[in-house]
Amino acid sequence: MSGVLGIRDLGLQPYEPVLEAMRRFTEQRGPESQDEVWLVEHPPVFTQGQAGKAEHLLIPGEIPVVQTDRGGQVTYHGPGQLVAYLLLDVRRLSIGVRELVSRIEQTLIDLLASYGVQAVAKPDAPGVYVDGAKIASLGLRIRNGRSFHGLALNVDMDLAPFRRINPCGYAGLAMTQLRDLAGPIELDEVRTRLRGQLVRHLDYAEQTTLTGGID
């Protein structure tokens, strides 16, 4: 079992400053640095992963597009979507990347099950799905044995912008969200449940809430 997982609740934050802060944290951390999870919502933004292709951006319109260094293709972030950035020393956890992805997916599956929603992972398409519709996306980057980027769970948001792209590079991929499957949902409650599931599935002894900025 690992040590203490530090968790920061950042609220609503623009995407690019958080991206830069993740990169700095990953580059500057040492062998004893505490692993952290940053929980955040973003204003509307499309992000292109390293495998992203321009043809999957159909009609972005007024929503900005940001090129990132995570895995995967294009996705959408917006208010009402819970994003968790996983800043983990994967070597210290002694797990491979595939195992990390599987644990994150199971974290989401168990979280959704706590709301009575049956979700599954797909071996050929990272993320979590309910009856074929995607409810959570996953994209990581590993640098020097440390992960950054993470997961995005659709909780209670406007799904319309997903129709402006081919989500994750799949034309016509249906998207869904927790509100439509389980009724009215408090994002704070989902955030709390996600914290507990991450600690359990990533095998940390406990969690602690971190305060202060990420500059």
From Swiss-Prot:
Positions annotated to bind substrate: 70-77, 137-139, 150-152
Compartmental location: Cytoplasm
BPL/LPL catalytic domain ranges (all copies): 31-206
One biological process term in Gene Ontology: protein modification process
This protein's pathway: Protein modification; protein lipoylation via endogenous pathway; protein N(6)-(lipoyl)lysine from octanoyl-[acyl-carrier-protein]: step 1/2
UniProt keyword Acyltransferase, yes or no: yes
Listed EC numbers: 2.3.1.181
Gene Ontology terms for molecular function: lipoyl(octanoyl) transferase activity
Function: Catalyzes the transfer of endogenously produced octanoic acid from octanoyl-acyl-carrier-protein onto the lipoyl domains of lipoate-dependent enzymes. Lipoyl-ACP can also act as a substrate although octanoyl-ACP is likely to be the physiological substrate.
UniProt cross-references to HAMAP family, sorted A to Z: LipB
Protein name according to UniProt: Octanoyltransferase
Gene source species: Pseudomonas entomophila (strain L48)
